[in-house]
Swiss-Prot record:
Gene name of this polypeptide: pduA
Major subcellular site: other
Designated name of the protein: Bacterial microcompartment shell protein PduA
Domain (BMC) ranges: 5-89
Originating species: Salmonella typhimurium (strain LT2 / SGSC1412 / ATCC 700720)
Cysteine pairings via disulfide bonds: none
Family annotation (PROSITE patterns): BMC_1 (PS01139), BMC_2 (PS51930)
Effect of residue 79 to A: Subject to propionaldehyde toxicity, makes about 70% BMCs, protein shells appear wild-type but leak
Recorded family membership: Belongs to the bacterial microcompartments protein family.
């Protein structure tokens, strides 16, 4: 995980998730690493980058998603432990 922050925005519905992803990558220097469909219409979008950029990106993503849908959760892990990669969806851990 290279000590990069991990940011997540969880939405109800794919449209809000796509809107969040678009806003996140446009608003800050972050890398969109994927998404996970949780079930019951919940979709989590995940980004990586330095802490400040990830915080700015998740704030922008959540605001954009609220314009078209519902935001369930927003969270930033500043320096996730390397073992956290074990629970990330396939294709997201690097």
């Amino acid at each position: 995980m290279q000590q990069e922050a991990l940011g997540m925005v969880e939405t109800k519905g794919l449209t809000a998730a796509i809107e969040a992803a678009d806003a996140m990558v446009k608003s800050a220097n972050v890398m969109l690493v994927g998404y996970e469909k949780i079930g019951s219409g919940l979709v989590t979008v995940i980004v990586r980058g330095d802490v400040g950029a990830v915080k700015a990106a998740t704030d922008a993503g959540a605001a954009a998603a609220r314009n078209v849908g519902e935001v369930k959760a927003v969270h930033v892990i500043p320096r996730p432990h390397t073992d956290v990669e074990k629970i990330l969806p396939k294709g997201i851990s690097q």
